[in-house]
Amino acid sequence: MIGRLRGTLAEKQPPHLIIDVNGVGYELEVPMTTLYRLPKVGETVTVHTHLVVREDAHLLYGFHEKRERELFRELIRLNGVGPKLALALMSGLEADELVRCVQAQDTSALVRVPGVGKKTAERLLVELKDRFKAWETSPAMFTLVSDGPVPVSGASTAEADAVSALVSLGYKPQEASKAVSAIKDKAGLSSEELIRRSLKGMITK
């Protein structure tokens, strides 16, 4: 089992990364909440990982915090929730927001995540409620993402990457394009910031 990786961030193509560890490139898929916190390509990065072994592939998922990985593991234990849906849930909602939804049995935010209808949201909340009783939503447990922009050059490429990342989460291409286009003052923003603002707009609308 690979539990953690520390190396050089070699590539970043949301929602995938490649981390170079002593000459070996590990490809990972990460939730957008982890992507927002990553350093620039070429810098050192540490991620906590979860390995999924399948007949045709070994898939590695990465997380900025251990407790994000714990949340991911809780989600994929549920019936009908695979890694893709778990990442979509964690990308659309901050970890503490998701825990609060479970504790309050609030489906309003969950149903805006691709692949989650009302019945599915209700079932997930019921199944997770007992598991999350001991979880507290506090800054000590989750490091929240800043609302500040992350500027970068090459806005057109950043926008294309943002749309591609949203589609990979399950949003329709038209929905993804519309969400990115709706962002005001987006010139110079990084793909990560465009994704963050797009998801925030779609989940909270």
UniProtKB/Swiss-Prot annotation:
The UniProt annotation puts the region (Flexible linker) at 144-153
Which is an annotated Pfam family here? Answer: HHH_5
Q: Where is this region: Domain II?
A: 65-143
Domain description: Has three domains with a flexible linker between the domains II and III and assumes an 'L' shape. Domain III is highly mobile and contacts RuvB.
Q: Which HAMAP family match?
A: DNA_HJ_migration_RuvA
Q: What is this protein called?
A: Holliday junction branch migration complex subunit RuvA
Q: Where is the stretch described as Domain I?
A: 1-64
